[in-house]
């Protein structure tokens, strides 16, 4: 039962409840008028009786997200890249703005205002939770609507867990996600593709772009290919290539906190003391594993490329470190995604 006490010019409702650990605690709520206190006495007694009383908890948004993160990662068997990306969202897009706010005090309006703030926030303003000094040009490059929708989706999931944990009666997340405007990407026709390939003199870049254009492969899928994935005699001699893995660079800390079954292989460090590693991982979805047909020009280029790899190995005179990938550096080590992207930009 609850009781009402007068304390100076206000009235307090006193009651007892059990916290999440089962300990008996005493609650106090103050009101300006006796009528407000009487109404609250009736409602709190009903809540305590039917189990709808919200146990007070000072957990902050940051604490809740870092509690939710490993559970969600383990439950859904996240890839290391997904884990790293989610940590970055929490550190750089949520904690600086909502991190210290207690989750039981977060209102839907607060989140609407938060999304509005993000829409005016420059990309890269925070890195690893530390505010950066930006150039005038960088200050004009704002977060995309897609990034804000991604934050919304993450918070929606995390706050639903808080409800399940009994920390909230209902989620404060707005029903509608922030709107996102998508820009149409220009699709190259065959003539444009051929013209682009003719300007590329680097054989590694040429083959990578050729694979991307003809087979619609992502960078990670291209670099994840191995010579054994190619069957030059399949499809009545047309030839096929099978996509079944992806190569990514990921933080070593993320590898320790994600499902090891998602990883096929971790390549040795090329730089001593590196905090990241190149890994071969499972494809994003089951549909990502597929077998594709080669065109005649692509088949010819792949045959020439395999011969180049053999010549590279001979030229290294025993110092060649065959990583087993289709795309390799002259010393046999794998080509990293960031290296391929850099070559493409230059």
Model-derived features with residue positions:
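Short regulatory "switch" loops immediately downstream of catalytic or recognition motifs
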Residues: 16-19, 113-136, 231-234, 244-257, ...
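Short, Lys/Arg-enriched alpha-helical recognition elements, typified by the DNA-recognition helix
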Residues: 57-163, 177, 324-326, 341, ...
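Arg/Lys-rich amphipathic alpha helix in sigma70-family domain 2
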Residues: 160-169, 304-307
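Short, basic (Lys/Arg/His-rich) helix/loop patches that form interaction surfaces
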Residues: 123-127, 198, 202-205, 215, ...
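Short, surface-exposed polybasic/aromatic micro-patch for ligand or macromolecular engagement
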Residues: 2-58, 285
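Basic, Lys/Arg- and aromatic-enriched nucleic-acid-binding interface segment
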Residues: 127-145, 149-151, 164-227, 235-238, ...
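Conserved tyrosine-mediated DNA breakage-rejoining catalytic core shared by Y-recombinases
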Residues: 7, 192, 225-307, 318
């Amino acid at each position: 039962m609850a009781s009402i006490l007068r304390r100076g010019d206000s009235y307090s409702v006193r009651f007892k409840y059990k916290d999440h650990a089962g300990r008996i605690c005493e609650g106090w709520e103050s009101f300006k008028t006796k009528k407000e206190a009487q109404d609250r006495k009736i409602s709190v007694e009903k809540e305590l009786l039917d189990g709808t009383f919200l146990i007070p908890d000072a957990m902050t948004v940051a604490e809740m997200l870092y509690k939710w993160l490993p559970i969600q990662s383990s439950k859904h068997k996240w890839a290391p890249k997904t884990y790293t990306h989610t940590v970055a969202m929490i550190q750089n897009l949520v904690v600086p703005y909502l991190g210290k706010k207690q989750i039981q005090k977060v209102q839907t309006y607060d989140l609407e205002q938060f999304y509005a703030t993000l829409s005016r926030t420059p990309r890269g303003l925070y890195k690893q939770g530390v505010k950066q000094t930006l150039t005038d040009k960088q200050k004009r490059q704002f977060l995309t609507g897609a990034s804000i929708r991604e934050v919304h989706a993450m918070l929606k999931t995390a706050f639903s867990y808080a409800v399940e944990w009994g920390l909230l009666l209902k989620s404060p997340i707005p029903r509608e996600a922030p709107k996102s405007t998508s820009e149409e990407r220009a699709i190259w026709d065959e003539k444009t593709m051929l013209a682009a390939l003719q300007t590329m003199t680097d054989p590694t870049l040429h083959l990578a772009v050729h694979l991307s254009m003809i087979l619609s492969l992502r960078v990670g899928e291209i670099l994840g290919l191995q010579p054994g994935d190619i069957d030059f005699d399949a499809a009545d001699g047309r030839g096929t290539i099978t996509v079944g893995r992806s190569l990514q660079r990921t933080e070593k800390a993320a590898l320790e906190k994600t499902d090891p079954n998602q990883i096929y292989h971790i390549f040795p460090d090329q730089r001593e003391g590196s905090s990241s590693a190149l890994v071969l991982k499972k494809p994003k979805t089951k549909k990502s594993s597929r077998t594709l047909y080669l065109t005649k020009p692509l088949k010819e280029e792949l045959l020439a490329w395999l011969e180049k790899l053999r010549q590279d190995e001979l030229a290294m005179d025993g110092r060649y470190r065959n990583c087993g990938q289709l795309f390799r550096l002259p010393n046999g080590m794998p080509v990293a995604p960031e290296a391929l992207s850099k070559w493409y930009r230059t």
